[in-house]
Structure formats: structure tokens, C-alpha cells
Amino acid sequence: MAAISMACVSSQCLSISSKLHNLSFSSTQFPNSSLKPLTFSANLSQPLFSQGCSSLGSFQRRGFSVVCEVATLKKADSAAKRTRQAETRRLRNKARKSEVKTRMRKVFEALDALKKKSGASTEELVPIDNLIAEAYSAIDKAVVKGTLHRNTAARRKSRLARNKKVVEIHHGWYTPSLAPTNV
């Protein structure tokens, strides 16, 4: 049985050997004379491609060399960095402006509700005063951060105070003093 299997293995090896022999390359295909064509080794104990080109066989070390290539690293594009910074600033400024608008809107809604309410008392102004204080704080923070111009901030604060004064006059809680006229 072992003899039959050895015969099959040897016949298969011979057929593979003949097929691989047809695959060998001629030296005319490789202009480099150091490359040899690949051939099949008849002896199985030797390496499979004993006459082939091996990169490990011709490796020679000439010495130590240190290569520093700092110049090849590309410096980050400053225009792209400025674009990224502008985008983050835009989002922050947008959030601050939105906060200011939201706080002002809450004050105006509360003042409108109080103006429409009949029989309102002065104690109902306390929560509105707190809302106005929060709006002032948001406006002042936006000015400090550079999101709003100080004149715009002053105009918005004045608008809040004027609307509060209109509600107070409407309910009779405040009577404006007449300015003396000089003749």
C-alpha cells in the first residue's frame, strides 16, 4: 500500500516538475543580469527555488546611518486653521446671541401677559424683574466676549426697560414726571 502511494506521489511530483519547468523565464525578459530565471529543484530536500532571486542572500550591511527628514513634513495650512477657528467662533457667537434673544423674548412675553391681565398687583413684577436681570446678564456677557457691540447691548437693555415702564404706566404703578420747560 505504501509503495502504491509513493508511486502516486512521485508521479505527481514529476508532472508538477514538468509543468514548472515550462514556467521558467529566460534572461531576455529581465534586463538586469543579476536576476536569474526561476527553475524547479529536482531534489526536494533543497529549497524550492534554489537558483531564483533571493533578497536575503545578497543582503550586505555597510554601516549605520541616521536619516532625519524634517523638511519633508508639510506645515499645517494656516488658512485652514483660521477657517476652523472661525467656524468654532461662529457657533459660540451664535449660541450667545440666541441666548440673548431667548431671554429678551421671555421678558416681552411676561410683560405682554401682565399688561393684558386686569387687576394685576406690583408683586407680579418681581419674577419679571428677575427675568430682566437674567437678560441683562446675558447681554453683558455677550459684550465681554465680543459677540455684541456695546451700543447694541445698551439699545437692547433700554428696550427691555422701556417695555417694563410701559406696563407700569398702563397699570398706574408709575407716573412719569413732567420735565420743566424753560421759557
Curated annotation (Swiss-Prot):
Residues 1-68 form a transit peptide. One of its GO terms (molecular function) is structural constituent of ribosome. Disulfide bonds: none annotated. Residues 79-99 are annotated as: Disordered. InterPro entries: Ribosomal_bS20 (IPR002583), Ribosomal_bS20_sf (IPR036510). GO terms for biological process: translation. It is found in: Plastid, Chloroplast. Pfam families: Ribosomal_S20p. Keywords: Chloroplast, Plastid, Ribonucleoprotein, Ribosomal protein, RNA-binding, rRNA-binding, Transit peptide. GO terms for cellular component: chloroplast; small ribosomal subunit. Gene3D superfamilies: Ribosomal protein S20 (1.20.58.110). Its main location: plastid. HAMAP family: Ribosomal_bS20 (MF_00500). Component of the chloroplast small ribosomal subunit (SSU). Mature 70S chloroplast ribosomes of higher plants consist of a small (30S) and a large (50S) subunit. The 30S small subunit contains 1 molecule of ribosomal RNA (16S rRNA) and 24 different proteins. The 50S large subunit contains 3 rRNA molecules (23S, 5S and 4.5S rRNA) and 33 different proteins. Belongs to the bacterial ribosomal protein bS20 family. Component of the chloroplast ribosome (chloro-ribosome), a dedicated translation machinery responsible for the synthesis of chloroplast genome-encoded proteins, including proteins of the transcription and translation machinery and components of the photosynthetic apparatus. This is Small ribosomal subunit protein bS20c. It comes from Spinacia oleracea.
